């Protein structure tokens, strides 16, 4: 099956519908539009829990994260609430987002309805975890194209399952944020906007990853297109040069922040122009030691203060 051709034909059909975001953008407003509380900067620094690689308890890792200068941490779903909350409160970190643990293994795009049901249950548990931690957003990979799943099937199946979770998201006050990843799905900003348009809920927005998109397009164009529906940002580097030299696209991520292809000054200016107040969450290698965490926090700070 030619996935690219299938996608073009499918998007030609969906593109003929009216863009709801253009008609009523206010209904899609993200949870980032109000002014930050007194004493807090507009964009705060956080790190993805899964990138903190050294051994230790939840409390040990949170202390190291806080000691490095991070304000928050994006937890994984399906963790022990009591342990996480105790460590959070002792250390003084915030939890702005929770990343779903099940969405790759149990994709909402699966042709197997039992797998989709497990994926939906995982999504719903992630929402409950976020509520318990005081997080306003969760990260969701909506599905994958390939292995017998077409672009259209991924689109329709994932939207069907996400809609089933919206009532719980609304009840809990937690937003579902779709992340752009390397899943052969939604590689253009116009596609992302149409996807959110079709879901048509203020409880579903975007979790934009600046590094993942470099392989396909311009992060700044994505930011401008999807604002104000971006709830959270992943700050991650990618080197096109390294990816091409090694012949392995994944090797492009093996580069420190500020040393890849991202135009960070332009990205920060684009984010500021949208009026975003919220979280920049680093999903970057290097967090295997306290020294590595310190370096990540310093590099993230250098990015955020660019004018």
Q: What is each model feature region?
A:
Residues 70, 135, 230, 276-277:
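A structural motif
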Residues 14-22, 109-205, 215, 265:
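Active-site acidic/histidine proton-transfer and metal-coordination neighborhood
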Residues 279-284:
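Short acidic/histidine-rich active-site segments
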Residues 271:
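C-terminal "capping" alpha-helix adjacent to the active site of nucleotide-linked donor transferases
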Residues 66, 98, 163-261, 265-268:
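Acidic/histidine-rich catalytic cores of soluble enzymes
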Residues 2-132, 170, 201, 205, ...:
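N-terminal pre-domain/capping segments
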Residues 52-57, 72-84, 107-108, 146-150, ...:
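Acidic-and-aromatic substrate-binding clefts and catalytic sites of carbohydrate-active enzymes
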């Amino acid at each position: 099956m030619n996935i690219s051709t299938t996608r073009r034909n499918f998007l030609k059909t969906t593109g003929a519908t009216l863009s709801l975001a253009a008609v009523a953008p206010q209904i899609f407003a993200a949870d980032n539009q109000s002014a930050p509380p007194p004493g807090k900067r507009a964009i705060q620094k956080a790190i993805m829990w899964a990138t903190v690689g050294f051994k230790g308890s939840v409390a040990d890792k949170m202390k190291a994260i806080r000691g490095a200068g991070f304000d928050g941490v994006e937890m994984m779903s399906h963790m022990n609430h009591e342990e996480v909350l105790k460590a959070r409160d002792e250390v003084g970190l915030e939890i702005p987002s929770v990343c779903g643990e099940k969405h790759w293994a149990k994709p909402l795009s699966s042709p197997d309805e039992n797998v989709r049901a497990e994926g939906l249950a995982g999504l719903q548990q992630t929402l409950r975890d976020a509520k318990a931690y005081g997080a306003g957003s969760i990260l969701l990979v909506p599905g994958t194209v390939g292995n017998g799943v077409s672009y259209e099937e991924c689109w329709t199946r994932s939207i069907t399952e996400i809609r089933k979770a919206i009532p719980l998201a609304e009840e809990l006050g937690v937003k579902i944020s779709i992340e752009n990843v390397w899943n052969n799905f939604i590689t253009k900003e116009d596609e992302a906007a149409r996807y959110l348009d079709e879901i048509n809920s203020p409880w579903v927005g975007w979790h934009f990853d600046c590094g993942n998109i470099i392989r396909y397009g311009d992060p700044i164009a994505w930011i401008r297109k999807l604002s104000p529906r971006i709830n959270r940002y992943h700050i991650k580097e990618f080197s096109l040069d390294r990816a091409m030299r090694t012949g392995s696209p994944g090797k492009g991520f093996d580069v420190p922040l500020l040393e890849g292809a991202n135009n960070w000054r332009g990205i920060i200016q684009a984010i500021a122009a949208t009026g975003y107040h919220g979280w920049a969450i680093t999903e970057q290698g290097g967090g295997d030691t306290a020294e590595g965490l310190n370096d990540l926090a310093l590099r993230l700070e250098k990015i955020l203060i660019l004018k």
